[in-house]
Every structure is written in structure tokens, then in C-alpha cells.
């Protein structure tokens, strides 16, 4: 009988498939994965310690750089934590603008994730560019509102830094008209491509019990069939005023996770349409004029969490009464969602690791901080 020997190979930290500087120490028997050990820390920037040396407002642009795909969502969670700590109220119009920006971010993130997944399977560049097509239109909207495309620094305590410009909503309506056909076409790429189906169906299965035990959230958890979404479980901002569904998968494989993201794009479009219907027409309502930006919250602590595109994003803040946080802690969904990677890869082929990792949808700036 032919004898085989297990080998240990490194994938990363500098590798095009790892979505950042991330190393996987993989034990293989031939082409089969026996074990996998993720190695973090290559992009550690001391984010939390730096935040404790800054004022509360100075930390807002730092949150942009956690998950640079989703700066609006990062801003939202941090602003909510400070507002709870300092007792700051947010005007109704500002709440609607915040939801609008975060749901646009969700569409942007998921379109990119689908493009990256197809890219990871070997369909080089063209599908990725297709996934990025509508993303560019959303970035144009962000630039209209905030002046920046990626790291927007748009939220402030008590609202947003400036109101929507006059040209914003007409351009947004044009995007909403084009989105259904775009999402349908993305879905056809998933459903009708035989190679993609072979690389995704039954690969990287994360059973619901295992998903719960690791504490994963977002599309990774919902892909395993668990309908948990912070927007429904603990409604924040004005999410309780919107009608939307929580898509879930069946078996928790790569295919389910990306079908969940496709459907979430449709649900985000539904929410945005409801935002436009309900958006209060209040001049100056984009921010609470009484809210101080150089806040000195009373002694205490606060935790705020939101449903970011990658999962549950939370900020825990402790105040000692000064203008700087005594303790600043981030609950990063990319980090938590990476923890079951070894369980998701065992028994599959080395070539499947790249696809499984891509289906988790991580950004190393958020993982390592």
C-alpha cells in the first residue's frame, strides 16, 4: 500500500488569496487538508491603544480604517457608543441618513465580496470588475455627501457632518432603478455556472451548532440557517420602522453564504426605498445643534452594536470623565468569523481553502486592528 506523509505548508502572509497579510499554516496529506492554523497579527496597528490617547472625536476617522470597505458602518457603531455614553440625542432626519449610508455600504460590500469570490476561483479580473461596477456608483454617492470615497469620516455625535446635497437623491434614484437587473445578473453568475457550482456547493460547510459555538455573525451565521440579525434582534436607530426579510441558507456551505449576500443586497434596496419615502424634510436636521463634539462623558461605560455588512460590529467604551476614553474595545466581526476557519477547511482540498476564506469575507485591518 502506498504510504503518504503529512506536510506543513504556509499560505501567506504575502499571498494574493489571503485578502491581506494573513498566514495559514496548513497540514496536508497529498491535496487534502488535515489541519489549519490561522496566524494573525501582521497588520496590527495598535488601534485600541491609540484610541485611548485620542479625544472621542479624533477617533472617528480611525474607525474608517478598521474595515475600509465599510467606513460608514464603522462610524455608525462608534457614534452610537459615544452617544449612549454622553446622552446625546440624534435628530430623526439624521437617523434616516445614517441608515441610508449603511445600507448603501452593505450593497457595496456584498457586490465586492461576490466579485472577489469568483476571482478566487480562478476567473481572473473580469468578474471582479463586474462586481465592482455598481460599487463605483455608490462610491460616487459617498463622495457627493462626504467628500471622500472610501474613508468617509461622515458621522458625528448627534448626526452626520453635513446634509445630503441636492444632487444626491436624484442620483440615488437612478442607482435604485439599475440595481435589480444588476443583482439578478450577479445571481445568474452564481446559479448558472457549472464550474462555480462545483467549487461552491458542499464546500466549507459550517453546521449551525458549530457556527453558534464560535459566535460568528452576519452572512456567515445566516448562511448556516440561523436568522439572526441585530437590526431585527435588537433594533437600533430607525430600523424598527422598515419592512425587510432576513435571508438564510440551508447547509452552511460557500454557495449558501454568497446566496445570502445576494439576497441581502435586495433587502438593502428595499430599506433604502423606504428611507426615501419616510425621510423627514427638516432643514438642519442632519445633526443635533446642541451636541458637543469635544465631549466629556460622565463616568460610566456603554456598548453599542450594529449589523455591519460582515456581521455584528460593537464598540465598548469606558469613560473616566475626561475627554479621552479610559477603555476602548472593538468587537470586530471579521476576527470572530475567522475563528472556525480550521473546522471549515478540514477534509477539503488545498484549492478549496482560498474559496472558503473568501466566503467568510474578511478585511485584515479589522481582524488585526
Swiss-Prot record:
This protein's record includes keyword Translocase: yes
Keyword field: Cell membrane, Membrane, NAD, Quinone, Translocase, Transport, Ubiquinone
Gene3D superfamilies with a match to the protein in the record: Cytochrome-c3 Hydrogenase, chain B
Catalytic activity: a quinone + NADH + 5 H(+)(in) = a quinol + NAD(+) + 4 H(+)(out)
Localization of this protein: Cell membrane
Domain of life, per lineage: Bacteria
UniProt-listed InterPro entries: NADH_Q_OxRdtase_suD (IPR001135), NDH1_su_D/H (IPR022885), NiFe-Hase_large (IPR029014)
An example Gene Ontology CC term for this record: plasma membrane
EC number: 7.1.1.-
Any one GO molecular-function label of the UniProt entry: NAD binding
Similarity comment text for this entry: Belongs to the complex I 49 kDa subunit family.
PANTHER family noted in UniProt: NADH DEHYDROGENASE [UBIQUINONE] IRON-SULFUR PROTEIN 2, MITOCHONDRIAL, NADH-UBIQUINONE OXIDOREDUCTASE 49 KDA SUBUNIT
Record's function text: NDH-1 shuttles electrons from NADH, via FMN and iron-sulfur (Fe-S) centers, to quinones in the respiratory chain. The immediate electron acceptor for the enzyme in this species is believed to be ubiquinone. Couples the redox reaction to proton translocation (for every two electrons transferred, four hydrogen ions are translocated across the cytoplasmic membrane), and thus conserves the redox energy in a proton gradient.
Protein's UniProt name: NADH-quinone oxidoreductase subunit D 1
Source species: Chloroflexus aurantiacus (strain ATCC 29366 / DSM 635 / J-10-fl)
Lineage of the organism: Bacteria, Bacillati, Chloroflexota, Chloroflexia, Chloroflexales
Gene transcribed to yield this protein: nuoD1
